[in-house]
From Swiss-Prot:
GO terms for molecular function: ATP binding; ATP hydrolysis activity; mRNA methyltransferase activity; RNA binding; RNA helicase activity; RNA-directed RNA polymerase activity. This is Replicase large subunit. CDD domains: Virgaviridae_RdRp (cd23251). Residues 794-953 form the (+)RNA virus helicase ATP-binding domain. This protein is translated as a fusion protein by episodic readthrough of a termination codon. When readthrough of the terminator codon TGA occurs between the codons for Leu-1112 and Gln-1114, this results in the addition of the RdRp region to the replicase. Residues 822-1080 are annotated as: Helicase.
Length: 1612
């Protein structure tokens, strides 16, 4: 999770800084989806609670060891051996996971309470009391169950449903849950279908291994899963074996094996060593003369070994595996019974068919690697005897000592000198003033004894040398005799004792007449044999899967039945299956019923299974349905006459404004709610309801339910506050408040005052709704106990509206209006309010607005002329109109910001106003109606307003030009503006919300927030008191209003869904101002990025949105040179300061880096380096002093560094960066099959069909001559002395570094020490063999590639690149893809090698040479002779290999071909790790980044751009072709280099730069070049002036010299 969170944070930061703008949204979404998918998968794992207190390291250890579980670490229980005790729960759950749920299971020595808690009523625990400790533990288990039940009883909770069956079984039949018998003697049995299983958690130690198989067979156990502690060291000749991960130790004494925990006082456990070893080493556990249990190890986790014992029937074995053999006992019996018969008859009778099987288990001992067993001698002064023991010591340490002391003279070869040397190399050493730890960690307590052994070994070795020498001179005696003679001369009188000790101790093997040093085996094999007699043959029964298949067949037939329906792909299959299973219904029957309904063959006919159609189907039938049918049958005229004649009726009144009479008496007062029980108000369920009638009626019903749900939710929350009030701080102002009537004080003080209503708790505990009156800030209460209020009960809003709507129903149904409804859809600031004021007739029309602020604003604007036209009667808020309905009719109804309202509310407003026409003004892209009641259903089709006519307004009178540019990305149609302000948007990211203070951080204009919490916090800080507009509002509250200046503030650092580029809240916030908008945020978020992007839009573009701008005519120029670049000479102008300014603008801060002494600082300071296994020669840590080279100093300041000196630390840092710590991102991959598939795709994508065949003759003399012509004479001279009889070691490479650091074109040099580039290369002799070979293979590959579509950039000039891209059609919509891969070389592994080898094979690589090449690139050794570093690498790409460049190019091409449909690609270019693809715009692509991670092990980032960037060059395509510009930023960076040695070197440098940047002389396409640079560098400005300056200085030799000066003189 840390990885996903860090990735998402990086994406947000990049968005704010303007990086990766083209793919940032896609990348963020992908990271989010991956995180959600992984977290959802993790959440489905079984959950285990780990309550013991353990360390953070142990938490990580347990989590990594058991990834199958979601472990929650509470750290709430201190206990002995917490780690091991807590792991027992995990181990038990892991064992039970292996068993099919519900299968009969025996837990051998188990804990019955653990199974009760999990609700496993199918487990029987055998819990024998083998000692007093067992009795105590079983009592403790019973106590835990009692404690658990008491805790439930105290909290008045019942048992969870899943535990009830297990606890009931224990209550009714406890012997079925557990018994006190040994597993071998357990009498419990159950006769149920299915297989039987067993688990043994740390309990098989006490079951004799010879009885285990029979005991399992007695219970007919199918598989037994077991777990036990063990250490491989117990198989060695050692008395103790520590288990470090759980802090325990095994101690062996004879056959007694003790187990105890370290560093604590606990009971010990004792077992039989021989019995434990049998379980470890045996494979077969015979159960009878037919059945045997076969043991297999499963895994080892945290010092616990898991295995399973599977029952095997030997009768299932193939008959041919048995052999004939004689049974000796049967032979003698037959001879006794039939002595008179011949011996042959007796032999035939005793012959039996025997099966023999053998299994071997290898045990690996990691601690004995590179160790030898050295004998130690200890003499006794008292007895005069000598004891011998053994110790394991590092092999390298032993032979280092022996080799060194062999160089001593005879006089110096003493015990003291040997001990002194051993002690010195064991201790820490000082190298160049630095303390370095010895690489050998040998126990100091054995150094003296080891020194004596080394002395004896050296004496013996010298004597052996003399014996061998004399043997060639004396042939009358054996080597052994001469050897003993020399020993006798050396030790004198001690010879007999020494001789006896040497022979008995193993130094001298008399039988073999040789000396031997013992080396322990890393692996020890234990074999187990099984012999069974053949008696019968049976067939292995197949698994019965008929029932699941029958069920699957039924669902398949049912879904086949349903497939005939239209839009069947939207059918919810999961819900269909759940319905059939819950109701136990045949799926086929259900499917036929559904099909019949959908085909109108049954009732409930509707076309589509949508809520709207279902509502129509459930609507009541018209009352005159029968009469309609009669008319259709009998009438001879048209069924629907155009003129309808009425017998009688009433004409409408000609005037408006008179009172009208409601069918009901009057609007019911909210007083009906007073003292109403809360239970009568609460909604029991908010599940999706089915509404009937037309869509308008359904919307109105849904709105009434919404009001009821809102009141219900508020009442429910107030009841909860009354229940939870105790323990709260009475002085803390909260959203809710509780007043104690008896005590006369606030138990919980609310923020608001004078609430309209609340919930009161009566003395009998009943809760009722009360309408409140206040006096002196306290509610006037009746005979109540407590009263609860909240911010939702400040006014009667929802109560009043609901009562009004209920009073207007007719027969319980809302009656919609038939007035004409017109929707005016306008952009922000289009003059909707102005249009209302210009159209409305205040005498007979009504204006309704959602909020009070808007209502005041309309009244103020309508009456600004001095004549009062607008009043509180004809301009009202929606809430006021619905709560205080007046019996009056209106001609026209104007609803401002009507789309912010519930559509049912709009329908009610139109109906209750009795208007003839309704004008609903709104914005489909701004904030819609927000459903603020959780879980209340507001279907999507209800959110669409039903209207008769729609008018569109796309001219904004309010918004400045830059905001208009943003709105054009939101609305259909072109949005224009009349505002003269061009730029108005700005953003500022502050360090934190503590910065905001009215005095130090004043905010201009109207202050707006996104959330209520931010609004409240700004109020607390005093901003409302100093604001010119007084009140601070949220974005939602001021929709529809206009201000000159706006300040939007975000104080919440956590992610907000309201703030996204597509959020309507962002659109509303950006469109409230006429002059200026400034956004203050504590985090980088999408709105900051929007502001940043708007600030970069050119004034020319913004002027086009103004309607009063003049008409701009574009000059059309026809083609002059079709297919060629238009050439406009670049003016040679500008100064050095122009280049410096451009560099500082694109890479701010890089020119201020003082890096001259970075290398010196790194060598002097302490460094912590993460180094893999390698050998370092510290004698090379201090380089030989050399005279420092003088270099020219550049005038232009860049991040370039001086060349560095090679040395141990510098080379090691480079090796770590380039070769160590390679990524490991690959998932599970079939290397061979996947590689073959990738190569086939590579071949199909890039190779011309006519040339797709192989070539078997790449090695020719012509190929060798072509290669040799490219080599230097010195290389050929080195090869002249090589005999080529055998190759040097092909798996050995040399390592060196480049002295000049690579310049980076980002801001990383400011805080990162750049590692040097490395060169890993073969010897010249190997290159002489494989250089011509791969050069020829490369030539053949490039000849076969479709060069019209794909460019493999090898030895191509800029002109050739331009020619390749010149046929791009600029009229075709396309985009550029770039796959940026970091750590490219060291990310390549075995899979990449397999892909590359298959490609070379297709081209005809020789089989023998291919195998040699493979071995040289599998496990390779690197040696850096300059720095004294040796290490080993696997499969990485070597930077100095003969196939480095073409291999990298092929791999990146194969990578993209495996993920992207290359047949859809327009153009593609590959070079090393660089790639660029032109694809059609909108092409649907797979998740390339994920594929690069999981298949190719690449840390990749995908960029979508308009212009390509390839090998440091910008590819600018246009209607005439394409032009390639060398990166100007890279050029300027090179002009700041610090490695120029002389004027001649400077001139060579200028010429090389002129060659690569020749295209900059053409300024015709500088505009496109600037756009391309802006895609890469977000701070880029128009750099044409800098480009001209570059051309000026490169084209003049003398002028170029002024860019550098040598330190000893002035410029020049």
């Amino acid at each position: 999770m840390a990885h996903f969170q860090q990735t998402m944070n990086n994406k947000v930061i990049e968005a704010g800084m303007g990086r990766n703008s083209l793919i940032n949204d896609l990348a963020q979404r992908r990271v989010y989806d991956n995180a959600v998918e992984e977290l959802n998968h993790r959440s489905r794992r079984p959950k285990v609670n780990f309550s013991k207190v353990i360390s953070q390291e142990q938490i990580i250890q347990a989590t990594n060891a058991y990834p199958e579980f979601e472990i929650t670490f509470y750290n709430t229980q201190l206990a002995v051996h917490s780690m091991a005790g807590g792991l027992r729960a995990l181990e038990l759950e892991y064992l039970m996971m292996q068993i099919p749920f519900g299968s009969i299971t025996y837990d051998i020595g188990g804990n019955f309470s653990a199974h009760l808690y999990k609700g496993r009523d199918y487990v029987h625990c055998c819990m024998p009391n083998l000692d007093i400790r067992d009795v105590a533990r079983h009592i403790n288990q019973q106590d835990t169950v009692s404690t658990y039940l008491a805790r439930l009883e105290r909290s008045k909770r019942g048992l969870p449903v899943f535990q009830q069956s297990a606890f009931n079984k224990y209550m009714n039949d406890p012997d079925a849950v557990c018994c006190d018998k040994r597993f071998q003697d357990c009498s419990y049995s159950v006769d149920l279908p299915g297989k039987t299983y067993a688990v043994a958690l740390h309990s098989i130690y006490d079951i004799p291994a010879d009885e285990f198989g029979a005991a399992l067979l007695r219970k007919d156990v199918h598989i037994c899963y077991a777990a036990f502690h063990f250490s491989e060291n117990l198989l060695l000749e050692t008395t103790s074996a520590p288990l470090d991960e759980i802090g325990a130790t095994f101690y062996k004494s004879g056959d007694r094996l003790s187990f105890f925990f370290q560093n604590e006082s606990t009971l010990n456990y004792e077992h039989s060593y021989k019995n434990v070893i049998k379980y470890v080493c045996k494979t077969f556990f015979p159960a009878s003369n037919r059945f045997v249990y076969h043991k297999e190890f499963m895994c080892t986790r945290v010092n616990t070994w898991f295995c399973k014992f599977t029952k095997v029937d030997t009768y299932f074995l193939f008959r041919g595996v048995y052999t004939r053999g004689e049974d000796s006992e049967q032979f003698y019996t037959a001879m006794d019974e039939a002595w008179e018969y011949k011996k042959t008859l007796a032999m035939l009778k005793c012959e039996r068919t025997i099966f023999r099987d053998r299994a071997a288990v290898n045990f690996w001992f990691p601690k004995v690697k590179d160790m030898v067993i050295v004998p130690l001698f200890d003499g006794s002064v008292t007895s005069g005897k000598m004891k011998r023991s053994e110790v394991m010591v590092n092999k390298d340490f032993v032979y280092t000592v022996l080799n060194h002391i062999r160089t001593y003279q005879d006089k110096a070869l003493t015990y003291k000198n040997v001990l002194s040397f051993v002690e010195s190399i064991r201790s820490r050493v000082i190298i160049n003033g630095v303390s370095a730890r010895s690489e050998w960690d040998v126990d100091k307590s054995v150094l003296q004894a080891l020194s004596m052994t080394f002395l004896l070994q050296t004496k013996l070795a010298e004597a052996k040398d003399q014996v061998v020498l004399k043997k060639f001179q004396k042939f009358d005696d054996t080597v052994t005799n001469l050897f003993w003679k020399q020993i006798s001369d050396a030790v004198g009188d001690l010879f007999p004792s020494i001789k006896e000790t040497l022979i008995s101790g193993g130094f001298v093997k008399v039988a073999e007449q040789s000396l031997q040093i013992k080396t322990p085996d890393e692996y020890i094999t234990f074999a187990d044999k099984l012999v069974m007699e053949y008696k019968a043959t049976e067939e292995l029964q197949h698994l019965d899967i008929s029932k699941p298949l029958e069920r699957a067949e039924k669902y398949y037939n049912a879904l086949s039945e349903l497939s005939v329906l239209k839009e069947c792909d939207e059918f919810d299959i999961t819900q269909f299956k759940n319905l059939c299973e819950e109701k136990d219904i045949d799926p086929d029957v259900v499917a036929k019923v559904i099909v019949a309904i959908m085909k109108n063959e049954l009732t409930l006919p509707f076309k589509n299974p949508t809520p709207e159609a279902l509502s129509d189907a459930l609507s009541p039938l018209p009352k005159d349905l029968d009469m309609r049918f009669d008319l259709l049958k009998l009438s001879t005229c048209a069924p629907f006459p155009s003129v309808k004649t009425l017998d009688s009726g009433l004409l409408p009144k000609q005037s408006y404004g008179d009172e009208r009479q409601f069918e009901s008496q009057s609007v019911v007062s909210v007083s009906d709610f007073h003292l109403k029980s809360v239970e009568s108000v609460k909604m029991k369920s908010m599940s999706s309801a089915v509404y009937t009638g037309p869509l308008k009626v359904q919307q109105m019903k849904n709105y009434m339910d919404y009001l009821s749900a809102s009141i219900s939710a508020t009442v429910s929350n107030l009841c909860k506050v009354l229940k939870d009030v105790y323990g709260a701080d009475p002085e803390s102002a909260e959203k809710s408040g509780v007043y104690d009537v008896v005590k006369g004080k606030w138990l919980l003080k609310p923020k608001g005052k004078c609430h309209a209503w609340g919930v009161a708790e009566l003395n009998n505990g009943e809760k009722v709704i009360v309408l409140l009156e206040w006096a002196d800030g306290f509610p006037i209460c009746g005979d109540w106990r407590r009263v609860a209020v909240s911010s939702d009960s400040l006014i009667y809003s929802d109560m009043g509206k609901l009562q009004t709507l209920l009073s207007c129903l007719k027969d319980g149904e809302p009656v919609p209006s038939d007035a004409k409804v017109t929707l005016v859809d306008g952009v922000p600031g289009c003059g909707k309010t102005k249009e209302i004021l210009e159209t409305v007739n205040f005498d007979e029309d009504l204006i309704l607005v959602p909020g009070k602020e808007a209502c005041k604003m309309i009244i103020k604007r309508a009456n600004k002329s001095g004549h009062v036209r607008a009043t509180k009667d004809n301009v009202r808020t929606v809430d006021s109109f619905l709560m205080h309905l007046k019996p009056k009719t209106y001609n026209k109804l104007f609803i401002d910001e009507g789309l912010m309202l519930h559509t049912g509310c709009v329908n009610f407003l139109i109906a209750l106003s009795h208007c003839r026409e309704a004008m609903v003004f709104g914005d489909t892209e701004q904030i819609p109606f927000i459903n603020r009641v959780a879980n209340f259903p507001y279907p999507k089709h209800f959110a669409t307003l039903v209207y008769d006519h729609r008018e569109v307004r796309r001219l904004s009178l309010r918004c400045p030009a830059d905001v208009t540019h943003f709105m054009n990305s939101k609305y259909d149609g072109k949005v224009l503006c009349t505002n003269d302000v061009i730029r108005s948007v700005d953003a500022e990211v502050v360090r934190g919300k503590g910065v905001f203070n009215p005095k130090s951080k004043p905010l201009k204009g109207k202050i707006i927030t996104f959330t209520q919490s931010d609004k409240a916090e700004l109020k607390e800080r005093g901003y409302e008191e100093v604001s010119t507009f007084g009140e601070i509002n949220t974005v939602h509250e001021i929709q529809g209003e206009t201000f000159e200046d706006v300040s939007v503030v975000r104080l919440t650092p956590t992610p907000l869904e309201l703030i996204s580029k597509s959020s309507p809240h962002v659109l509303v916030a950006l469109t409230r101002h006429t002059k200026s908008f400034k956004y203050y945020s504590v985090v980088l978020d999408p709105l900051v990025k929007v502001c940043s992007d708007l600030s970069k839009v050119s004034d020319f573009i913004l002027d086009m949105y103004k309607v009063d701008a003049g008409i701009l005519x574009q000059l059309q120029v026809g083609s002059i040179f079709k297919g060629e670049n238009l050439f406009v000479p670049c003016p040679k102008s500008g100064y050095i300061s122009d280049m410096q300014f451009y560099y500082d603008t694109l890479l701010p801060g890089n020119s201020t880096i003082l890096n001259e002494y970075d290398a010196v600082t790194m060598n002097l300071r302490e460094n912590n380096l993460n180094v893999k296994d390698c050998t370092i020669d510290f004698s090379k840590s201090v380089s030989v002093p050399r005279q420092q080279q003088e270099f020219f100093t550049p005038v232009i300041r860049t991040a370039a560094e001086r060349p560095r000196s090679r040395g141990l630390l510098e080379n090691l840092v480079a090796m770590i960066k380039r070769n160590f710590n390679s990524p490991d991102l690959t998932g599970i991959l079939d290397i061979e099959d996947t590689a073959e598939l990738v190569v086939n795709k590579f071949w199909d994508a890039y190779i011309i069909d006519e040339l797709s065949g192989g070539n078997v003759t790449p090695m020719t003399s012509d190929a060798f001559h072509r290669w040799m012509a490219k080599q230097e004479k010195s290389t050929i001279g080195q090869l002249a002395d090589f005999d080529f009889v055998d190759l040097p070691a092909i798996d050995q490479y040399k390592h060196m570094i480049k002295a000049q650091p690579k310049q980076k074109l980002d801001l990383s040099p400011q805080d990162e020490y750049a590692a040097l580039q490395t060169i890993v290369y073969h010897s010249k002799q190997i290159n002489a063999i494989f250089g011509p070979l791969f050069s020829e293979l490369t030539r053949q590959l490039l000849e076969r590639i479709d060069s019209s579509k794909f460019l493999f950039y090898t030895r191509k000039t800029p002109e050739q690149i331009e020619e390749f891209f010149s046929d791009l059609d600029s009229t075709v919509p396309m985009e550029v893809l770039e796959l940026d891969i970091s750590k490219y070389d060291k990310s390549q592994n075995e899979f990449h090698c397999a892909v590359e080898y298959l490609i070379w094979e297709k081209l005809g690589l020789n089989g023998f040479l291919e195998e040699v090449w493979k071995q040289g690139h599998r496990k390779t050794s690197l040696k850096d002779y300059t720095a004294g570093i040796k290490t080993c690498l696997w499969y990485q790409r070597k930077s100095g290999d003969v196939t480095t460049f073409i291999g990298n190019t092929v791999i990146i091409a194969a990578c993209l071909a495996s993920m992207i449909p290359m047949d859809k690609v327009i153009k593609a270019a590959f070079c090393g790790d660089d790639s660029m693809l032109y694809i059609p715009k909108g092409l649907d692509l797979p998740d390339i980044q994920s594929g690069a991670n999981l298949m190719w092990n690449f840390e990749a980032k995908l960029y979508r751009k308009r212009y390509g960037y390839f090998c440091g060059r910008y590819i600018i395509h246009h209607d005439r072709g394409a032009i390639v510009y060398y990166d100007p930023v890279k050029l300027i960076s090179k002009l700041g280099c610090k490695h120029i040695k002389s004027l001649d070197h400077l001139e060579e440098f200028r010429i090389s730069l002129c060659d690569v940047s020749a295209s900059l002389n053409n300024c015709a396409y500088y505009g496109q070049l600037n756009d391309a640079i802006a895609e890469v560098h977000k701070t880029a400005v128009n750099g044409s002036f800098a480009f001209c300056s570059i051309v000026k200085y490169l084209s003049d030799k003398n002028l170029f010299r002024t860019l550098f000066y040598n330190g000893s003189s002035t410029k020049g």
